């Protein structure tokens, strides 16, 4: 096999070695696989634990330990249980797994064989036997890598060269266990997922359960967010070294099997076949603070572009501090940075079109009525069903990044903006290890989130500005869509995930999770029993949070929770009879109808003092109630300037002036007429 052959040479120059002065400085094995079409697995090198000083052989699933080939670098014979091991030869010595002592002269090495059981396996080998160049620069694309991918049955899904391997991620790139992007030499189906070239290897270093992303992606797909990335947990080996449990996912990209919309980037490139877009000078607003400059864009001067530039666009909400690192994008007039993932190098016309479209949508969402100054409703710009579903994912998961970063939207040609694909939940579901988290399942998250310090000079008004999910809750029709989706769709998907699917994930991953915990020293112990107990405790944090979250949303995610509001009622003049001024009753931005949506009752509304108005919902608003008050004044009372808008206070002032004028005229007439009365 191509990968296996290269693995041996990689081991020789860059495997996992003991100190070079050690009598046994390297040790590696290769086991036969049990799959129908696989004859050998990749090479696995030993790894030394700083916790107990032992060397671990983390073996992939489907390993036949009864037929292991060993390779080593030693100064003398290598003995195990009184039997000499032959370099490059097969042995049955390790058939039952467990702990063994290797000896070279007087030096002894304890080697522990651990076995994954049900996960697919990926072996990658780099041409120089290391990852130093990638780790020094995550954007560096390593060429000449090879990959062997074995599915959960041990059969080969891919055995060929990679086009490239590089680093990925923002905060996750700073962890010891690194995430990567790989690009295959040709499209392939990996582990039952749809055929593609580009894939992501997520490390999930901060997620001790290793399952947060997988759980939430599964629910996203179940509720109908069709662009949700498919994913599988795998064991990853690079140059023979076990890297732990990774989550291989479909990349967020425009592709027939990913985000299936018109590829504007490809169409633009086709019209400029000899142009390297990355060499073009950047235009617009760039630099360190460009992500904080409202109503700005960044683009490239591209000679030719398609006639139709209405799509497709793949966009991501991003932090202002990260925005300068991206090629193209725009910042809305309310300081929301939006980067273009595709087209990565956008023309000025493309940026002006999509930023203008987004701005009109934002204006409509920010308005009290849901309509912008052009008279267009926000639902004319964004697909409200995907918008509601993505909100529910962000809310239910307790995602700290909700509406801040890793939130994607896309727009097809002549279509509306759609929400998705969902992405990046390793810090969700009460992951206190990640630093930023929502730990209380009984509080709102996405519904109340604001923009994240995106303004220049720490503009506090921006920090208090609702982000895109919170904006939806200004509008009754959005809340109704969310409520309907929760009751008829999301709740059942969440229950199914928590009550059935998670058990399947655990069964598949638990053995590998123990290996991963030892490899990355999660619990400062190598005891399998202690690690298993700790792992299940960490997993319980996730399931307890999501279960409580489900209960909280089931009780509170309803339009009735938003309440009714009654318009300000100006002070009224005493007439001696009941005073029943006209009122406007709303639920969010929806004006309700008396007798259909509510009943109204007045009390203490005859004599001078404070009258009370009570509105009781009916029909769709049954169970909702609101109260307000207004003042009843005598003519001689001073004007009341409290409450209401400036316009309402002006009207009240005029009404009071009119009332006093009429009363004054009546008083004068009374004294003129009085002498003639007998």
Stretches with model-predicted labels:
Residues 1-19, 657-678:
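Gram-positive cell-envelope targeting signals
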Residues 11-119, 559-646, 650-652, 656:
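Beta-rich interaction/scaffold domains
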Residues 223-235, 399:
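Short, well-structured beta-strand/strand-turn elements
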Residues 143-203, 347-353:
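Conserved oxyanion/phosphate-binding beta-strand-loop segments in alpha/beta enzyme cores
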Residues 134-137, 193-195, 212-214, 246-248, ...:
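Short, solvent-exposed loop/turn and secondary-structure capping segments
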Residues 96-98, 109-156:
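N-terminal module-boundary/linker segments of secreted carbohydrate-active enzymes
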Residues 188-189, 203, 224-229, 241-392:
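Internal "kinase-insert"/substrate-recognition segments embedded within catalytic cores
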